[in-house]
Amino acid sequence: MFRSILTKIFGSRNDRILRRLNKIVIKINQLEPEFEALSDDDLKAKTDAFKARLAQGETLEQLLPEAFATVREASKRVLGMRHFDVQLLGGMVLTNRCIAEMRTGEGKTLTATLPCYLNALTGKGVHVVTVNDYLARRDAETNRPLFEFLGMTVGVNVPGLSPEQKREAYAADVTYATNSELGFDYLRDNLAHTAQERFQRYLHYALVDEVDSILIDEARTPLIISGQAEDSSELYMTVDKLIPDLIKQDKEDSEEYQGEGDFTLDLKTKQAHLTERGQEKVEQWLTEQGLMSAEESLYSPSKISLLHHVYAALRAHTLFERDVDYIVKDGEIVIVDEHTGRTMAGRRWSDGLHQAIEAKEGVRIQSENQTVASITYQNYFRLYEKLAGMTGTADTEAFEFQQIYGLETIVVPTNRPMIRDDRTDVMFENEEYKFNAIIEDIKDCVARNQPVLVGTISIEKSELLSHALKKAGIKHNVLNAKFHAQEAEIVANAGYPGTVTIATNMAGRGTDIVLGGNWKAEIAKLDNPTEAQIEAIHTAWKARHEIVKAAGGLHIIGTERHESRRIDNQLRGRSGRQGDPGSSRFYLSLDDALMRIYLNEGKLNLMRKAFSTAGEAMESKMLTKVIASAQAKVEAHNFDGRKNLLEFDDVANDQRHAIYAQRNTLLDNEDISDTIDVIRADVFNQVIDQYIPPQSLEEMWDVPALEQRLKHDFALDLPLEKWLEEDNHFDEDALRQRVLDAAIEEYKQKESIVGEQTMRSFEKGVMLQTLDELWKEHLSAMDHLRRGIHLRGYAQKDPKQEYKKECFQMFTDMLDALKLSVVTTLSRVQVRTQEEVEQAERQRQEMAKRETASMQYNADEDSGEENTRRVGRNEPCPCGSGKKYKHCHGSKAKY
C-alpha cells in the first residue's frame, strides 16, 4: 500500500530513469541544427575525432550526446530515416547495460545503430545478436550503408562461412551474428591447435535482439560440440519393441494407493518413472531377450546403461509427439523449437533421447555422441564485458534478467499511443466448441476485410485448425515448421485485407506485419522496377492500408494460453504497431494443456459445472485469475529450472574458464619449456613420494620398485640402490634432486639431437593434445555424475554441494593426470639424429627399389615370355640386393 502511494507521488523507478534520460535527449535535439549544417566529409570526420578524444581520456558517456547526434544525422542522409526521441531513449538504455522493452514496430533495428556506433568507437568490436540467419543478414544489409558512411566496417557471421570469411566478420567494427554461431565459434576457438585458427577477439559488447528468446527461452539448451561415441543403435531398436506393452498409471504408488500400471508421467518436467510392477515387467522381458540375467536388477551398477535405454525409449513414446515436439523430414528427426515453432536443423536431444525417437519412428539411428566442448547461453553471454538486449516483451521476466544476468529492464514508451483493443479471454467446455467460436470470429473478420493472425502452440494444432477452416471454405495460409521456407512471403502478405494466417507460436517473429501488405516486398520481387511501377504499387498499398484500418486493423486470435504471459504478449504485440488500430482475443477450453497440467482436478470440475448449455462461452474475472495463477506457477517452475541449471553449470563454468585460459596461454606462447620444467619437478616428486614417503625412515623406502617405475614410465634406467650404497649419507632430498637432474639431463640430450625449436613445438603439441583428451573425458564424467547426483538427496545430503565437492576432486585428479601424462610422453619419446633419419630414408628407398624389381621380375616370369638373356644362377641379382641371383629372385625363376 505504502509503495503504491510513493509510486504515485514520485513515479516508478522506470519513470525516474526515463526522466533522467530525457534530459540527454533534449541535449541531442539541441545539437541537431549544428549537425545538419555539417558537410558529408565533416560528418564522416566525427568518427576519427571521437576516437581521438577517447584516446585522450574522455569516456563513452561524455561522447554520447554528440555520437547519437552524428548517427541520427547520418541516418537521415543515408537511410532517409530520422531516429525518434523514443529511439534515442532506447539507445541510451542499451548503452547502460540494460534491457530495453520496445513494442513491435518501434524500430529496434534502427535504434540498435546508436549504441553499436558508440561502443564500436573503442575499436574492440560490437556483436549484434539475432535469433536466425535471415535477420542477421537483413539487419546487416539494412544498416551497412549507415555504418560505412561513418567509417565503420560491418561483418555478418552465419553458418557456412569459410575460416577467412569468419575472421573478416569478427574483425569488423560491428558484427551481426546468430546466437548459436557465436557460441559455437567460442567453443571452436577453444579447440583450435594454433593461435591463427581462432576467430573471436575480446568479447567486448553484445547487443542481443529478441533477448527474451535467447537468454530465457533457450537458456536451458546447452551448445555442444561432440564426437561420435560407441554405436548402440541395435539396443535402441530392441528396447523400442518393449514400450508399447507397458501400461500408463495415473499417479505414483503410495501407502494409500497401489496402481495397476507400469509407469507414471510428470508432464511438467517431461519425465517418466517405472512403477515396481513396471520394473519387474521390464526386467522379465529383458531377461527373455538375453540382455540381463534373472538374478540381476535393472538398477544394479552394471545395468545402468540398459536402464538409460529403457527410460529414453519410454520418454520417446509417451512424452514426445510427432508434429508437436519434432517432425520427420527426409528420413531424419528434426526438433521443433517449443517457443518459436521453428525447426532446429542440426540440433539433437542428448541422453539417448534422439536415438530413442529415431527407433520409434523407424528412421536410421545415428550414433550417440560424446561431448567434446559445451557451454550454455547463460554462461556464454556473461563472458561479455558489456551486455544489453532489446525485445517487445521483457518486463514480465525482469526479475530473472536481474537475478541471472544483472540486467535491469527499462520499458521505453511508444512513439505513438497504443490503441489496440485487447479483449477478455473466452472459455469453452471443450476444444470442439472453442474451434467453432474461432471459425465464427474469423468469418466475421473476413467479411469485413479485416486481416486475422491465428496463433497456435504446435504444428498439430495449426493443422487441425487449418482442416476446420478448409471445411468451412475459408482461404488461409499456414506458417509452421513444415512451411518454414515460405515464412517471409507469408508474413509479408499477412496484413492484406481479409487475409487469414495461422502461425505456430512466434513463427515469423522479427518481421513486422504491415497493414495492407508489405509494399516494399512487392517491389523487391521486380527486376529493375520503374518509377511508374513503384508509384503504382505504393498507391495500391495506400488504398489497401485504409481499408484494413477502417476494418479495425490486424485481429489476433490466440487458440490457447501459453505457459508464459510473455509469449502471449508477443502474439498480441504483432498487432497495433506504431499507433495502428488492432485487436486481440484468446479462446480457451478446459482441454488446453495449461489447464490440464497446472490446474488441480477440483478447480477443473468446478469450472465444468459453470457450463450449463452446450457450446456456451464463459467470460469472468475469476477465469482471468485462474489463468494468471496457472501461468504464474509455470513461470516460477521454469525460472527455478533455469536457475538450477545455472547453479550446476557454474561449477563446470569455473573449470571451463581455467582450462580455456590455460589453453589460450599455450596457443599464444611458442616456448612453454618453463611450464614443462615445473610440471616435471611436480610429477617426479609425486612419484618418488609413493615409494619414499616424505620424512620417513629408510626401512619404509621401496627403492627397487621406484627403479622399475622410473624405467617403465619415464625410460630412466637409474642405479638408485647403487647410489645409496656408495654414499652412506645420501638422504631423501639428495636422492630426489639426483633423479630430477638425471631426467633433465636425459631430456636435454634428446633436445640436442632434434634441436630446440623442434622440441618446443613437440612440447606444445603434447600438452594441447593431452589437455583436450582429458578435458573431454572429464566432461563425460561430470555429465554422468550430474545425472545421478539427485539420488544423494535420499541420504539427506545436498545434491548441489555434493556435486561441487566431487567435481572439484575430479578436476584436481584430471590436472594431476595431465601432468603425469605429459611428462611420461615427453620422457619416453624416441628421437633420432639427422644422419639416422637420412640413413633410414636411404634404406626405405632401397627397399622400395627391390620391391619394384621383384614385382618386375615376377611379372616377366609369370607372363610366360622368354627373356633374350638369361641371368646366371651365380651372377649378382639385378635387383641390387648384392645377393647371388640363385639366393634372391632366381630362387623363384623357372629353369
From Swiss-Prot:
Where does the protein end up?
Cell inner membrane; Cytoplasm
Its taxonomic path starts at: Bacteria, Pseudomonadati, Pseudomonadota, Gammaproteobacteria, Pasteurellales
| The organism's place on the tree of life at top rank | Bacteria
Q: Which residues bind ATP?
A: Q87, G105, E106, G107, K108, T109, D512
Q: Which gene encodes it?
A: secA
Pfam families attached to this UniProt entry: P-loop_SecA (PF21090), SEC-C (PF02810), SecA_DEAD (PF07517), SecA_PP_bind (PF01043), SecA_SW (PF07516)
Q: What is its EC number?
A: 7.4.2.8
GO-annotated cellular components: cell envelope Sec protein transport complex; cytosol; plasma membrane
What is the name attached to this protein's record? Protein translocase subunit SecA
Q: Which UniProt keywords apply?
A: ATP-binding, Cell inner membrane, Cell membrane, Cytoplasm, Membrane, Metal-binding, Nucleotide-binding, Protein transport, Translocase, Translocation, Transport, Zinc
- What InterPro entries would the database entry show? Helicase_ATP-bd (IPR014001), P-loop_NTPase (IPR027417), SEC_C_motif (IPR004027), SecA (IPR000185), SecA_CS (IPR020937), SecA_DEAD (IPR011115), SecA_motor_DEAD (IPR014018), SecA_preprotein_X-link_dom (IPR011130)
